[in-house]
Swiss-Prot record:
Its EC number is 7.1.1.-. It holds the Pfam family Ndh2_N. This is NAD(P)H-quinone oxidoreductase subunit 2, chloroplastic. NCBIfam families: NDH_I_N, PRK02504.1. It is an enzyme of class 7 (translocase). HAMAP family: NDH1_NuoN_1. It comes from the Eukaryota. GO terms for cellular component: chloroplast thylakoid membrane. Coiled coil: none annotated. GO terms for molecular function: NADH dehydrogenase (ubiquinone) activity; quinone binding.
Length: 510
């Protein structure tokens, strides 16, 4: 009898929760329509996987890519609409959030073609891979629009859990297992520190969780200059620092980059930084409005350490993926300059513009690593010597992406860095910009060293990997080459058309 009553209560409670969720989705679903498209794509993938065989593999790629493209289209149609706060204050829709969501969707859309041939060659489970990618994308999008401390904590956990699973997707590889273990342990530790910081904000503001209400609560309780806010600032900086991976929170980055499947690294290297940057700008600019000097100082220290350590250690690397890992640490130092500058001197606009270029430069480079690795099975920088003699397209596209990463004119990376540094200079960050300029010169050295290897024609320097290099038929190779072509064009052409891109980015004030 007691069990029967408990069962009825459970059913009633479950029904109430379901009806409440349905009510929220019915009346607020239009505000998260791009996210709903991805959710529908996830459900469709699961349904097709459970009712079909492996011969329907092309459908999996088609559904995933179509969901992402439709979500991008929905975002573009919603551009310029008035800012809206929905789901009882948990989610905010505005141009600033949407442009970061667009960047995340763009990353995912370009990463799926990179994965096609890799999945076929390594015989990985395709459905789970695409499910994790779409779910991580969904988590990143929710993080960009999060408007309260709980959502800001839960959304990156959705992204992080999928990232852990993706990094350990090749279970038979010892390096992949090691990367997953380190990633999981450090990710769990950083999440606990992050939520500890949120708890201090919650208590100091009198029990508020919405970002703007936290500010109002701190004013009402007169706690905006209390030691608790300093503890919250340090804890949240450490938690977000793990997602952005600036020095000294970068220890996981080289090992995860080296041990994870290359398409996964390409995905994580850009999406995690875009989502974390969107979250960092809102958290530091709103709840810590009264502590701007303190968080500016913290971020300046992180930026200096990242630019110096990232670029100097990258010189000594022999693995291509580890080199890009340290390079990404240096690159995030440049992005932090834009976060520090803020809206006052177009800091956010320059940061968004540079991140758009960074996506194309980085993914183009990883496309080359995927293609070369599948042909040769090596990731050693030395083994790329003489690639131009066997595959001129791959070598030239790689050279363009690397030169753009280094910031050489007239490529997009040069103009992106130029505007970013100019905004920092106007804001009075002279020392920070000087460090950025010097470390950019250092980065050009190790990028040019790789390009020199690619273009060498001396037989004594060409390794057996390149001598035995064979291009696959165009049919099996076109997805990687398509992504690479798009990335190369995006990393070169926009350099001569910066003004329209900057104008769009300047409209993203929140």
């Amino acid at each position: 009898m007691i069990w029967h009553v408990q069962n009825e209560n459970f059913i009633l409670d479950s029904t109430r929760i379901f009806m409440k969720a349905f009510h929220l989705l019915l009346f607020h679903g239009s505000f998260i329509f791009p996210e709903c498209i991805l959710i529908f794509g996830l459900i469709l993938l699961l349904m097709i996987d459970s009712t079909s065989d492996q011969k329907d593999r092309p459908w999996f790629y088609f559904i995933s890519s179509t969901s992402l493209v439709m979500s991008i289209t929905a975002l573009l149609f919603r551009w310029k609409e008035e800012p809206i706060i929905s789901f009882s204050g948990n989610f905010q829709t505005n141009n600033f959030n949407e442009i970061f969501q667009f960047l995340i969707l763009l990353c995912s859309t370009l990463c799926i073609p990179l994965s096609v041939e890799y999945i076929e060659c390594t015989e990985m489970a395709i459905t789970e891979f695409l499910l994790f990618v779409l779910t991580a994308t969904l988590g990143g999008m929710f993080l960009c629009g999060a408007n309260d401390x709980i959502t800001i904590f839960v959304a990156p956990e959705c992204f992080s859990l999928c990232s852990y699973l993706l990094s350990g997707y090749t279970k038979r590889d010892v390096r992949s297992n090691e990367a997953t273990t380190k990633y999981l342990l450090m990710g769990g530790a950083s999440s606990s520190i992050l939520v500890h910081g949120f708890s201090w904000l919650y208590g100091s503001s009198g029990g508020e969780i919405e970002l703007q209400e936290i500010v109002n609560g701190l004013i009402n309780t007169q706690m905006y200059n209390s030691p608790g806010i300093s503890i919250a600032l340090i804890s949240i900086t450490v938690g977000i620092g793990f997602k952005l991976s600036p020095a000294p929170f970068h220890q996981w980055t080289p090992d995860v980059y080296e041990g994870s499947p290359t398409p996964v690294v390409a995905f994580l290297s850009v999406t995690s930084k875009v989502a974390a940057s969107a979250s960092a700008t809102r958290i530091f600019d709103i709840p810590f409005y009264f502590s701007s000097n303190e968080w500016h100082l913290l971020l300046e220290i992180l930026a200096i350490l990242s630019m110096i350590l990232g670029n100097l250690i990258a010189i000594t690397q022999t693995s291509m993926k580890r080199m890009l890992a340290y390079s990404s640490i240096g690159q995030i130092g440049y992005v932090i300059i834009g976060i520090i500058v803020g809206d006052s001197n177009d800091g956010y606009a320059s940061m968004i513009t540079y991140m758009l270029f960074y996506i194309s430069m980085n993914l183009g480079t990883f496309a080359r690593i995927v293609s070369f690795g599948l042909r040769t099975g090596t990731d050693n920088i030395r083994d790329y010597a003489g690639l131009y003699t066997k595959d001129p397209f791959l070598a030239l596209s790689s050279a363009l992406c690397l030169l753009s990463l280094g910031g050489l004119p007239p490529l997009a990376g040069f103009f992106g860095k130029l505007h970013l540094f100019w905004c920092g200079w106007q804001a009075g960050l002279y020392f920070l910009v000087s460090i950025g300029l010097l470390t950019s010169v250092v980065s050009i050295y190790y990028y040019l060293k790789i390009i020199k290897l690619l273009m060498t024609g001396r037989n004594q320097e060409i390794t057996p990997h390149v001598r035995n290099y064979r291009r696959s038929p165009l049919k099996s190779n076109n997805s990687i080459e398509w992504s690479m072509t798009v990335c190369v064009i995006a990393x070169t052409i926009p350099g001569i058309s910066m003004n329209p891109i900057l104008a769009i980015a300047q409209d993203t004030l929140f």
